[in-house]
Amino acid sequence: MQSVLVLAAIVPAALAQTYYGCYTEIPTRALTGAVPLIDYEAMTLADCEAHCTGFDLWGLEYGGECYCGNSLAQGSFPAFSTDCTMPCPGDATLTSVCGGPNRLSLYGTSETAPESLPYPHDPPVTTTQYEGCYTEVTEGARALAGASGFSLTDMTVGGCGGYCRDSGFTWFGLEYSAECYCGSELSVNSTLAAEEDCAMPCSGAAGEVCGGSNRLSVYQWV
């Protein structure tokens, strides 16, 4: 079942279409329905909306790129809201957001968010298993060296787990209340710590634990 992250990014001024949130980009593009509009000097939300007239979806990336399509390509899925923080350069107030590095601020014509199809795991994974509180690696690669995410407002155990699973990883860990790290395995340099070292509440769920200072609440998809 697809994990839905609580998205709390800045929502731009009202437009004719619906804002769905921040989504991941893929190497072959999440939206491939038209020639992209590129303008790193003066891009606005309205410019991208107009460029994508006739399409069901449109997204802005890197502060100046606009992509259109009728569906999301496999591998694109909801990301953390704070991954989309690059301002639109054509907005003099710099309050509207035009995605981020490999992240799309996604809009569309439907009130319902588009279906996303993350890459499948082989064998499939269905549940998470808590592995314990582990130390972060302070020199070299992190304890979990795959994808990562950060959110001061909406980090949860389920959100991190879904993000890492959909990114293709089976291990995930939460640190400092707001950090999420993914990996295919846990570094041998990370060791089991005292459980009380992981006591920081998650930024998006005060009743959940998201690691501690240089400590990871570590889980595995099984």
From Swiss-Prot:
Residue spans crossing the bilayer: none
A GO BP entry: killing of cells of another organism
KW Methyltransferase (keyword) present: no
Domain WSC: 16-110, 127-222
Coiled coil: none
Record keywords: Antimicrobial, Fungicide, Repeat
Biological role: Inhibits the growth of the fungus P.tritici-repentis.
Name of the featured protein: Putative fungistatic metabolite
